[in-house]
C-alpha cells in the first residue's frame, strides 16, 4: 500500500517518528483487512483552524475536530479484494489536526504518537465502511482500533 503524507501546518513540530507511526498504522490496517498492494491512501496533517473549516463545510459543525475521512470510492468487500494488475484502488483522504491530536494526547495521558496512530486507524476504518452510529458498530470499530494499536505497539 502506498501512503502519501502532506504536512500542511506549522504550529506543532511534525517529527519523523510521527510520520513513521502513520505509515506503520496504515500498513497494519491494510494487512488486517487484506487491502490490495495497489491501494493508495492520502493523509493530510493540518491545524485546528483548517480542520474547523472542513468540519463546517462537510459536517455542519463549527468547531475543530480531530480527524475527518473522505472516501474516494464506496467499495464492497469483494471489490476491495480485487487485485487487478495496473489498477489502483484509491482508498481516500484522511485529514488529521495535529494540534487537536497533541491536545487530546495530553488530556488522555499518552503520547502524541499514540493519539496520531489511533486517529489514523479510526480514519482508515471509516474509509473502509466502519462506523460508530450505534453500540454494536461502535464496539466492533473500537475492537478493531485496539487490535491495530496493539499490532503497532501503541497500546494504552
Swiss-Prot record:
Note one Pfam family from the annotation.
Answer: YbeY
> Is this entry keyworded Metal-binding?
yes
Report the EC code(s) recorded for this entry: 3.1.-.-
Listed GO biological process terms: rRNA processing
GO CC annotations?
cytoplasm
Q: What residues bind Zn(2+), as annotated?
A: 122, 126, 132
Question: What one GO molecular function would you report for this record?
Answer: RNA endonuclease activity
Keywords linked to the UniProt accession = Cytoplasm, Endonuclease, Hydrolase, Metal-binding, Nuclease, Ribosome biogenesis, rRNA processing, Zinc
The cross-references to InterPro entries, in alphabetical order and at most eight, read: MetalPrtase_cat_dom_sf_prd, YbeY, YbeY_CS
Keyword flag Cytoplasm: yes
Note on cofactor: Binds 1 zinc ion.
Needed co-factor(s): Zn(2+)
Its primary localisation, in coarse terms, equals: cytoplasm
Which locations, inside or outside the cell, does it occupy?
Cytoplasm
Describe the task this protein carries out: Single strand-specific metallo-endoribonuclease involved in late-stage 70S ribosome quality control and in maturation of the 3' terminus of the 16S rRNA.
Per the similarity annotation, which family is this? Belongs to the endoribonuclease YbeY family.
- What is the official name of this protein in its record? Endoribonuclease YbeY
Tell me the organism.
Syntrophomonas wolfei subsp. wolfei (strain DSM 2245B / Goettingen)
> What is the phylogenetic placement of the source species in the record?
Bacteria, Bacillati, Bacillota, Clostridia, Eubacteriales
